[in-house]
Structure formats: structure tokens, C-alpha cells
Design a protein with these regions (language model features):
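Tubulin/FtsZ superfamily GTPase core signature
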Residues: 1-200
């Protein structure tokens, strides 16, 4: 939602969720409910994974419009991001789409269980993307120790948006040095994992 409000030049947004209420509240006009229930995943990645598998046809339709590159952004550690992002990434890559994951790892105050679940999610999504950027939220707290909880989450959202915008606008905006999609594809294809932990 934050990324959509910030806007990225020439990028189309789709919000996916297992929670129909969260989808209805989203400002993003193109929405995809994963699974039929619409009740959320209850912090259970397995439930979200099943919901995404139920929605493969809808995922294919969403991606089958000439899409050449997809950014899959997700907060790791909860249910939907952790469980569904790897399924969406897998399908995008199967379709020959350059697939970039940008994910966050939770703050320490969110608890060790959530962090462990997030790390499992990062490992799983890394199997299905060409490149994966991992943003360590706790590092933001180390750099900005005076942040309150709300500001810390806002900073994490901003960092995720900046990462996506930076990569997307290399292609979509004209600058002094112009790179096209093939240039970026050459760099990112099967590029592995990068850790983004400094924030700004």
C-alpha cells in the first residue's frame, strides 16, 4: 500500500492477500484474493501457501499480460507474505518473467518465532527468484536508535519502496546513462541474494 501511494514510474501494482478485508481496505485498485475463504492465514505460512496454490489460475492471468519483469514484495515472518510469495515467484519464473523478490525480516521486538519463520520464508522464496533483496528491519533500529515503533515500521516501508523504485526506474526513466530491460536482466538473471541493511 505504501509503495502504491508513493508511486513508481510506469509500474503496475497488484495487491495479493488471503484476507478479504485487508484487500478491500487497500488503495491498490487491482487486487487478488488468494484462496476462497478470505479470512487471512493466521500467521501460518502453510495455510497461505495452500491458498496461493488454490489461486494458480488467477495468478497466471495476473501475470499473463505481457509482463516482462515482476517485483514480489513481502514482509516475511507472518502468514501470507511468507507462504504465498514463494508460490507467486515460482509461477512467474516458470512463465519466463524476470522475477525479483524484495522482502523484509522483522524487527527483534516482533519475537524470535516470527524471525525464524521469516528466515525460512527467505530461504524458500530465494529458490524461485532471479534476484532477492533482503531488508533487515532490525538494522534500521541500530542506525536510528531513537525511532519509536510506528516510525520504525514507516522507515521499513520507505526502505522497501526505495529499493523497488531504484531498480524499476533504472529501466523506466531516462538518465545520463540509459539502461534498457535487457541490461538489467543480464545483471539480475540468476543473481542470487543481496542484503540491504543500511536503510538510507
Amino acid at each position: 500500500n505504501h509503495m502504491y501511494r508513493e508511486g513508481i514510474h510506469d509500474v503496475n501494482f497488484v495487491v495479493c492477500n488471503t484476507d478479504s478485508k485487508a484487500l478491500a481496505d487497500s488503495p491498490v485498485p487491482v487486487r487478488l484474493q488468494l484462496g476462497k475463504e478470505g479470512l487471512g492465514a493466521g500467521n501460518r505460512p502453510g495455510r497461505a501457501r495452500e491458498a496461493a496454490e488454490e489461486s494458480l489460475e488467477e495468478i497466471h492471468k495476473m501475470l499473463d499480460d505481457g509482463t516482462k519483469m515482476v517485483f514480489i514484495t513481502a514482509g516475511m515472518g507472518g502468514g501470507t507474505g511468507t507462504g504465498a510469495a514463494p508460490v507467486i515467484a515460482r509461477e512467474a519464473k516458470k512463465m519466463g518473467i524476470l522475477t525479483v523478490g524484495i522482502v523484509t525480516i522483522p524487527f527483534r521486538f516482533e519475537g524470535i518465532k516470527k524471525i525464524d519463520q521469516a528466515l525460512d520464508g527467505v530461504e524458500e522464496v530465494s529458490k524461485h527468484v532471479d534476484a532477492l533483496l533482503v531488508i533487515n528491519n532490525e538494522r534500521l533500529r541500530e542506525i536510528y536508535p531513537d525511532l519509536n515503533v510506528l516510525s520504525a515500521f514507516e522507515m521499513a516501508d520507505n526502505t522497501l519502496s526505495i529499493a523497488a523504485r531504484s531498480i524499476a526506474e533504472i529501466i523506466t526513466m531516462h538518465g545520463i546513462i540509459n539502461l534498457d530491460f535487457r541490461d538489467v536482466g543480464t545483471v539480475l538473471k540468476d543473481g542470487g541474494v543481496a542484503i540491504m541493511s543500511t536503510g538510507y
